């Protein structure tokens, strides 16, 4: 029996609140169990210098944990005058995940800033951020599309992320913090609704893991991705109809 009574192949309860803040073009507050993340998407009518003149857009992300999102206060990055390695790794991961399902050429020379702020952390903050940020991204792109329809709708597919791991020799989905801290193997999986992998991050925390265990964890992760994408679709409802069509109807 897991800490919260879930089955091994079950994700935590997910609650999505769209249009959470007033000013951002896309804003989602996502709760996965006790992990809570605010995902805002802002649009700029310019691109980084390395993208100028290409006709393509860009998507970049910033990730931050509020000081009391954890059991003990976390010092703000600004107070240390540097971004820690974990934060840098996660925000790059979020950016890669979202760029993987967007036709940047179709987007045009615009930058979409993804800001993910962890309000409360109980495991899976990076996966929660990716899954929530995708919904906010759709809202932001749809806002552009309604003002001036894209010739080709830029978002090609859904993308979501989940964690899997081996705890007490059990393979489990969507680890909370207590489970994550005891995991023999910890893995983050990012996939599209078409079943394609975007990224797999797997670590043998206590010991190596076998190819068989890897395959079983990937299968478990795929089940979790389907559950999370169903949540995304239910949240977006009719606003998801353009995804993958390439059209402007």
Swiss-Prot record:
Q: Which domain of life is it from?
A: Bacteria
Know the name of this protein?
Answer: Ribonuclease PH
Binding positions for phosphate per the UniProt entry: 86, 124-126
According to the record's subunit comment, the protein's assembly and interactions are:
Homohexameric ring arranged as a trimer of dimers.
The protein's organism comes out as Clostridium botulinum (strain Alaska E43 / Type E3)
Query: Which function does this protein serve?
Result: Phosphorolytic 3'-5' exoribonuclease that plays an important role in tRNA 3'-end maturation. Removes nucleotide residues following the 3'-CCA terminus of tRNAs; can also add nucleotides to the ends of RNA molecules by using nucleoside diphosphates as substrates, but this may not be physiologically important. Probably plays a role in initiation of 16S rRNA degradation (leading to ribosome degradation) during starvation.
Q: Name one Pfam family in it.
A: RNase_PH_C
Keyword check for Transmembrane, yes or no.
Answer: no
Q: What family, per the record?
A: Belongs to the RNase PH family.
Choose any GO biological process term that the UniProt entry carries and state it. tRNA processing
Q: Name one GO molecular function term.
A: 3'-5'-RNA exonuclease activity
Give the enzyme's EC designation: 2.7.7.56
